[in-house]
Amino acid sequence: LLFVLISVAANGQQAKYVFYFIGDGMGVNQVNGTEMYQAELQNGRIGVEPLLFTQFPVATMATTFSATNSVTDSAAAGTALATGKKTYNSAISVGEDKNPIETVAEKAKKAGKKVGVTTSVSVDHATPAAFYAHQADRNMNYEIAVDLTKANFDFYAGGGFLKPDKTYDKKDAPNIFPIFEEAGYTVARGYSDYKAKSKDAGKMILIQEEGKDPSCLPYAIDRKSDDLTLAQITESAI
């Protein structure tokens, strides 16, 4: 996000889109290792082959401890990335006092922008959830999914939903998909279904086809021709 805004300011141009990419667990070592591997692919060259984003005009470092732990988890890290505030491990965009913290995505929506949240894992996973939900525990998957409708963003996409009809305290609950539809969302299962429905849809939720693992998209090495991909999700969001 910072990179896009600074580049626009430097060039005096108006940005059509702002993309905020998060590599979950992707630290300096992972990036450097990838650049070394890219160089190795070039006839065994020693050194690094820079990735596109490491050549952006601005880069910075961030601390990775949470408010309560030396090692953060995805929930506290996602909250920090979404709100700029540190919180306790397992928190989804709430502070240590359990009160909600407004996210950058919510600010964009209030400013009249269209907003989408996409992921390669489940839509109710801690990292994407931190941008639209406010819950005391990352495992409150059903409650997080309900918050999706409250945020009222324009597009959500990912593997699926982990607990579509079971609350955090393991009680039966109304299935989440009719709730989505009542809130004005068109649910598409798979890329073909998305293409068939998107022309007549307003707000949309794109997930994998029925029967596929909702926890994440298939890894590239295991991917079948009809599996939903992150590239398709990104194209759909745009």
Place the predicted regions along the sequence by residue.
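Accessory "access/gating" subregions that flank catalytic or transport cores
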Residues: 220-238
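N-terminal catalytic scaffold of extracellular/periplasmic and nuclease hydrolases
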Residues: 13-198, 202-203, 210, 228-231
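Hydrophobic h-region of N-terminal signal peptides that target proteins for export
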Residues: 3-11
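Membrane-embedded hairpin module used as a gating/binding unit in multi-pass transport
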Residues: 210-217, 222-224
